[in-house]
């Protein structure tokens, strides 16, 4: 279940007091930088950085006062053990993951009858009718995003400069 999808530009002095809830949430910085508290640790996130908040973890976010940051924030329920991969990690997204997030935002605009730039909005009403398949596409893009991250960080691809020599098949 997806609870919220937001894409917004904070003011350079924005401060969100913090919250905790019983579902997952992640923040990805599209531009600028923010300071994020999760539990007792504080981290500065810059463009391309991604951080997950596990269920019931207190977290807040504050603009650092420089460039007004643009953030993608998505909260969702997932009880799969694979989610433990994201505990206490700071990740950087690649171009594929950036495109998947962009696709989620596009589908959210087709699906939800509200602005995506209100960080305090809790309930996201559906459009009546929404674009065919928009909710399913959001779910698929989010699953693809999570799987891609786990695969990329678990099994980094090493590119060889030379292809190994092989004998042609014998006929």
Feature locations, PLM:
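DNA-recognition element of transcription regulators
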Residues: 52-53, 139
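Ligand-binding loop in jelly-roll beta-barrel domains
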Residues: 56-84
